[in-house]
């Protein structure tokens, strides 16, 4: 059935809709658009670093491109797609709910995001741009940027943060209050668990960021001195406040991908539940809890005392335990399955392998003595891109491969989707693996020129980014081709216990008109 057959009411249907499926679709479209813009900025970065010398006119412009790339990818690509897109579409279906708890608030949450995106793009193009990186540290963001660019970036972060807080409250209330009475907490799917913990982290950490950037705004415009040491302030306070948000944000980005991969392993194997399902739930909760108390591992170089560094090193290493539980549970779930050619299997295995590799470099960086040496080098850049570019983004591709036919009623071309995986797998590895070695040799972040000794690693990385971009274009073609070829889903052979598949028609406005009861004997995950 055509997904858009019911959308005959023109633009007003999209602007005013309070239906969770319509809003989820809007989030997907917005996330795809933002991802393309963010990828364009990343390509500019790699073109600048492709060889020694200058491609962009100056370092301020280069740092503005870095800021735009980071904020676009984090706040406008990964979060809207993972939480807004997959969360809106699937959470009510998996809970047996007719819609989200606050449908109009859901609509507001989405429309705050395009506003926020316009503000951050404005910030990059006025007054020489916002060259502060996404961290917006003072005094670079105060005395170093006297123009209006940082003010626009702060308002952008406020709008995006408000969107996420309102959406988070909505998801929490939906999970608590609209869950079918037949679904107890232990019977919720792992995707619902990951979204629930994610939005809890959002509601906990985003007000802290809002406070920090509001103080920064008053420092810039109202002559306060929260972060100005010459008048009794302390810029270190800003770092603590920012990273109290910034580190949970990393888990906000990756946790929904964990849920998607868990659902994908069930789909691939046909098993009733993931291996160690209760252990997986506790691992999700542990990651969320520990992620809130390790923020200062981003700040080893600020001069913390030995006891603080010892604590934050140890606590950071502890996160590897629940993460390891999840990885081995996925592998144990996949164990014994019939190996058939399936692009979904490629994405799942690619995610597990590459996320694990990124996690290993994270264990290296958790050691404060090593991190002081490697801080602000490309080793750190490679680490968090392995976790995000090859973790969260591969999670998004996994989710699209898994649920595309469920959401749209059309089938993706398996061969071309496998080609997308191969291009992206080769491209992102070629981009970020060599940069580990550049970082170990001391190549610093946020510099637009470098000595010739680093040129080999950077040339390889730039070729990799071109391959990745080609993979993205092919992915967009695959999505369009599935519509144009009109390959409809005839029936889904999936006979597992995941609740969303009990829907006979995927495009009704409200899926459940009355309360639905699931059999808890079959609904084990």
From Swiss-Prot:
SUPFAM superfamilies, per the entry: Cytochrome c oxidase subunit I-like (SSF81442)
Residues where Cu cation binds: 247, 297-298
Binding site for O2: 251
Enzymatic reactions: 4 Fe(II)-[cytochrome c] + O2 + 8 H(+)(in) = 4 Fe(III)-[cytochrome c] + 2 H2O + 4 H(+)(out)
EC nos: 7.1.1.9
Assembly description: Component of the cytochrome c oxidase (complex IV, CIV), a multisubunit enzyme composed of a catalytic core of 3 subunits and several supernumerary subunits. The complex exists as a monomer or a dimer and forms supercomplexes (SCs) in the inner mitochondrial membrane with ubiquinol-cytochrome c oxidoreductase (cytochrome b-c1 complex, complex III, CIII).
Annotated protein name in UniProt: Cytochrome c oxidase subunit 1
High-level lineage: Eukaryota, Metazoa, Ecdysozoa, Nematoda, Chromadorea
Annotated gene: ctc-1
